[in-house]
């Protein structure tokens, strides 16, 4: 039978999931949650954190809380302006919520410690290497993880710790985070993370492709604007000659005198032809 944790001060979390082996700041604002933190500080600093199913619920019952949470140890507590309490906690282990035994003056719960399931060592080692390789690719593309964070992930040898560290760093929604917390099989957890990393890499490739297309389109538009401005300046220098064909010829003579590359020269010459045709269409009949 798994070890029971009875009478643990409990903080329902909104908008986040805490994993074992992770050190994280929590900003606590609700009165009952602050009292739970204070109670834990007065005892052994052990606290249970469980994510709410619906962030909009202000006074959750046991039915409003996820089945799986995390047992944490408070490392530091600070009181901030506005009645907020900021705690630095370190995740210890996964816990399954058995019951909320009290909601006043703060939440108290009974929990069962839940151990991760380690399968075939060879399979786990393969997953560990794959996750670290994929994570390295993603971190290089995303630029959202510090060098220290990347190094820490790359140095991990425990596949369970690796899964929790990478899950914490990935840009995923809380439903997916909770799903990873509740998955006890380390192999399946790592497999899920590989899938998420592959998807993030595909999204990154697509974003880069879109950005390149936009940049090329903007560069083309800027170049065309530059060429038209060149023609306008040449035209202004020549003055209005009246005859579109003569004017186009004079523009070409002026163009030859400019020190331009062959590509730019060809583009401007095409614009002169287009410009000449426009003048022919718009010139008044004699």
Regions found by a protein language model. Give the residues of each.
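Extended, charged alpha-helical coiled-coil/arm scaffolds that mediate oligomerization and mechanical coupling
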Residues: 157-283
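Positively charged
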Residues: 1-151
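Short amphipathic alpha-helical interface segments
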Residues: 148-153, 161-163
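Short, charged/polar micro-motifs that form catalytic or ligand-binding hotspots
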Residues: 23, 64, 152, 156, ...
């Amino acid at each position: 039978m798994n070890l029971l944790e009875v009478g643990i001060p409990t903080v329902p979390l909104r908008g986040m999931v805490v994993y074992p082996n992770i050190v994280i700041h929590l900003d606590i604002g609700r009165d009952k949650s602050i009292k739970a933190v204070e109670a834990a500080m007065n005892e052994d600093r052990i606290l249970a954190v469980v994510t709410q199913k619906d962030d909009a619920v202000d006074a959750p019952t046991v039915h409003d809380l996820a089945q799986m949470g995390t047992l944490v140890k408070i490392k530091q507590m600070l009181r901030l302006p506005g009645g907020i309490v900021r705690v630095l906690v370190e995740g210890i282990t996964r816990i399954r919520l058995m019951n909320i035994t009290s909601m006043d003056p703060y939440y108290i719960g009974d929990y069962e410690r839940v151990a991760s399931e380690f399968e075939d060592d060879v399979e786990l080692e393969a997953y560990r290497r794959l996750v670290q390789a994929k994570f390295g690719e993603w971190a290089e593309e995303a630029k959202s993880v510090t060098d220290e964070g990347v190094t820490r992930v790359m140095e991990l040898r425990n596949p369970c710790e690796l899964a929790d560290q990478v899950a914490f760093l990935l840009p995923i929604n809380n439903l997916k985070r909770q799903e990873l917390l509740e998955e006890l099989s380390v192999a399946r957890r790592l497999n899920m993370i590989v899938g998420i990393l592959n998807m993030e890499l595909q999204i990154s490739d697509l974003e880069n492709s879109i950005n390149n297309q936009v940049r090329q389109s903007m560069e083309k538009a800027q170049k065309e604007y530059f060429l038209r401005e060149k023609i306008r300046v040449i035209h202004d220098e020549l003055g209005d000659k009246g005859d579109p064909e003569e004017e186009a010829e004079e523009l070409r003579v002026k163009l030859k005198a400019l020190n331009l590359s062959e590509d730019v020269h060809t583009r401007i010459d095409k614009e002169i032809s287009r410009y000449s045709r426009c003048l022919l269409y718009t010139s008044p009949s004699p």
